[in-house]
């Protein structure tokens, strides 16, 4: 299913909840739920007895089927809660098994907002490590289509404590909302990818899958193509890449390239550190160390003299920056 499941983790008072709630109100879509005031049954559902009968009361996620739920203060969810959300997040199905058992659709777009469990982001060498403190099971981390990390140190205080100009909107609010509704109403057979787009997805998936460390499984070579495709669909819909009088959403190669740039910009950010973490893990891998050493030896041997090789390395700004 082409629905997003994302998380934003970062320091308190960075505006995570304020921005998400503001956008939800502006577009008139979605529901914001505070995990600190909501049990798992409130999110998914539970059984209650009325007289001699047991009834299922569905929670906020299945009640917003094909919509959006923003879960604020997601750090209040326990590790078992993340595991119990697995079927909703992977299959879009909510299930309650008590005295009675029922299932229902929960094809809901999910955005989790959370602070790091017990530290400030500055206490982590790489911000992405906070995810492992929050969610212990790798398979639950892997279900996120992407993760964003924010820190109070990212924006200078001087840029915050000053007057700002009012935002000028390019399009009216109702048109923006209609575009979202149109996107969400597309069925799977109404979303098509051009051949160039499909080839680009495979190309990007291979590149990302080979580089990023699966110890933090936000990117895995086995399934990252689906995450890239979902983000590409979002770009295509935002630009209204339509065909057949608006009934078809057409994803092109450019939209896939935008999706790849988006993911790279997230994971290469200093505060996120997923790129740097993966680079470090590769440097610690003995097999890769030998491969790199062999490559360097071959590289040096290709020069006519060692002096030429040393001169090139000393004048190479990329090597100096590393």
Which residues are covered by each model-predicted region?
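Conserved ASCE/P-loop NTPase catalytic core
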Residues: 1-185, 298-303, 307-321
């Amino acid at each position: 299913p082409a629905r997003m499941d994302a998380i934003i983790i970062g320091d308190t008072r960075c505006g995570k909840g304020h921005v998400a709630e503001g956008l939800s109100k502006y577009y008139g879509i979605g529901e914001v739920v505070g995990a600190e005031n909501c049990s798992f049954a409130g999110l998914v559902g539970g059984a209650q007895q009325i007289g001699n009968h047991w009834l299922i009361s569905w929670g906020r996620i299945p009640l917003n089927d094909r919509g959006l739920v923003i879960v604020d203060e997601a750090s209040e969810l326990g590790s078992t809660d993340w595991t119990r959300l697995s079927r909703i997040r992977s299959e879009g199905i909510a299930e309650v098994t008590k005295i009675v058992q029922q299932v229902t659709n929960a094809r809901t777009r999910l955005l989790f907002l959370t602070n790091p469990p017990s530290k400030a982001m500055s206490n982590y060498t790489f911000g992405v490590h906070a995810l492992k403190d929050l969610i212990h099971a790798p398979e639950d981390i892997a279900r996120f289509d992407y993760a964003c990390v924010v820190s109070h140190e990212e924006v200078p205080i001087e840029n915050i404590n000053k007057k700002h100009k009012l935002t000028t909107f390019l399009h009216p609010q109702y048109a923006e909302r209609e575009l979202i509704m149109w996107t969400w109403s597309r069925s799977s057979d109404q979303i098509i990818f051009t051949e160039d787009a499909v080839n680009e997805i495979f190309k990007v998936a291979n590149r990302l899958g080979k580089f990023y460390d699966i110890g933090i499984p936000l990117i895995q070579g086995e399934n990252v193509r689906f995450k890239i495709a979902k983000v590409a669909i979002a770009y295509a819909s935002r630009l209204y890449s339509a065909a057949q009088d608006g009934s078809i959403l057409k994803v092109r190669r450019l939209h896939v390239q935008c999706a790849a740039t988006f993911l790279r910009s997230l994971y290469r950010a200093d505060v996120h550190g997923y790129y740097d973490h993966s680079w470090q893990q590769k440097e610690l891998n003995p097999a890769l160390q030998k491969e790199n050493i062999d490559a360097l030896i071959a590289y040096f041997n290709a020069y006519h003299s060692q002096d030429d090789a040393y001169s090139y390395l000393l004048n190479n700004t990329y090597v100096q920056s590393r």
